[in-house]
Amino acid sequence: MIKPRVETIEYPQISALWHRRQKGDFLDGYRVKSSVRLSDAQNVGFQFPIWVKMLLSVRNQFMAIFGLKSGSGDSFVELLRSFELGNEAERVIGMNDKHLDFRISLLRDGGYIYMATWVRPHNMFGRAYLAMVLPFHIVICRNICARIARAYP
C-alpha cells in the first residue's frame, strides 16, 4: 500500500478560519491530494480508529475533573462528524469553552483536501491544555488526512 503524502502547510487564505485569527491563536494546516467530495472526506476522516477513540476517552475524563466540556468519546466524535457550517468548498465545526475556543475546518480546493484547527486559548489553563495535546493533535490530524487520501486517491 502506498503511503499518502500529508503535507504541513499554511492554511489557504480562502478559509473561513482566517477571519477569526488574532495574535496568540493557534492555526495549523495539512493537505492531501484528493478530489473527493467534502461529505465523503468527512465521513472517512472522522471514522476514528480505536487508538484515537481511546485518547479521546482519556481526554474527556481529564476534562471532566476540571468541569470543562468533555462529553463521552462518542458524543465528541459525533460533534466532529456534524460539520454544521459550510458548503461543498469548506465545512467548519467547533465549540467554545471556558479555557479555549476551537474550530476544525475541512476545505476542498484545487485537487486537495485541506484540514486545519484554529484554537484561541482564554487563560493559562487553555494554553497548558493546548501544549499538552498538541503532539497527539498533530498525529491525529495527519492520520485523518492519510485515511481520506487512501480511501479517495
Spell out what each predicted region is.
Residues 149-153:
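Short, highly charged C-terminal tails/helix-capping segments
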Residues 25-31, 90, 112-114:
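Intrinsic-disorder/low-complexity, polar/charged segments enriched in Ser/Thr/Lys/Arg/Asp/Glu/Gln
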Residues 119-140:
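A short acidic/glycine-rich loop-to-helix N-cap element
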Residues 106-125:
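Short acidic, glycine/tyrosine-flanked loop/strand segments centered on an H-E-D-like triad
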Residues 72-109:
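Hydrophobic-ligand binding "helix-grip"
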Residues 1-71:
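Hydrophobic ligand-binding cavity/cleft-lining segments
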Residues 44, 48, 105-110:
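Extended Gly/Ser/Thr-rich low-complexity repeat segments
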